[in-house]
Amino acid sequence: MNIIDAIINLANNPVVGVESHSQSNNRANQAGDALEEYVKDLFSGSFNLNETQRIARHAKVFSYLGNNSNPPDAMLRNGDAIEVKKIESKDSALALNSSHPKSKLSVDDSMLTKACKDAEKWEEKDIIYIVGVVDKKKNLKHLAMVYGIDYCADAECYLKIKNQIKEGIGNIGGIQFAETKELGRVNRIDPLNITYLRVRGMWGIENPWFVFNYIYQRNMEKSFNFMAIINEDKWNSFNNTDKLLAIQDSKLAISDIKIKNPNNPARLRNAKLITYHL
């Protein structure tokens, strides 16, 4: 299964009420968790299965299922990694917390658990950022799927800044620093030597609709807007694009576009823009 299957499932079965969908199957009703469950069903085509069948389908489609504390949210078996982000406002940025944006997911990433690294034989995976706008009534208003390689710069861009900040903090005189994976940690701040201070980085990135506003604008008069961007190399790697192209639906559109290279915006790359609305 891949992103093409997910888009086909969306067009054939446009479920957009994430809370009612999750509650009907006795699943998490927090909006973020419900969106993650929705995405799993979208990729595995398990919307209409009972819970036992759904679990079995997910085990077949995914090699790993994670959560906020154990990234990524999912890995398609022999396929891409998936990171799901929920925002409540159409213009909100994405909070990535302590993890910088990723163009790819590498097996040597220190944020990954052993279970994730051992889920299958892999070295590097493309990562799909899936962003949903869920309103207060738990309706999915907007959904975007973009690949990290088209959305984020290479890791060295972020690590360079992080390391410069960490080095600068460590060079502050008169303070006892401790080893940490964070930006810094100061021990023994008070006379009793019982207080410490952690210095953490909190990463964020603008949402895909903001980043790609030069090629796509949402129609706010529609109840639901979907956008996916797939670069040409990735599109050509799939063997099921003909099934998507064969769908006859006026609400579904596929067009050729050019997008900016995140590492050098002066260079453009060919891509497909897939849109759908209700």
From Swiss-Prot:
GO BP: DNA restriction-modification system
Keywords, alphabetical: Endonuclease, Hydrolase, Nuclease, Restriction system
The keyword Cytoplasm is annotated on this UniProt entry: no
Family listed: Belongs to the NgoPII type II restriction endonuclease family.
GO molecular function: DNA binding; type II site-specific deoxyribonuclease activity
Official protein name in the record: Type II restriction enzyme NgoPII
Top-level taxon in the UniProt lineage: Bacteria
EC number of the protein: 3.1.21.4
Catalytic activity from the UniProt record: Endonucleolytic cleavage of DNA to give specific double-stranded fragments with terminal 5'-phosphates
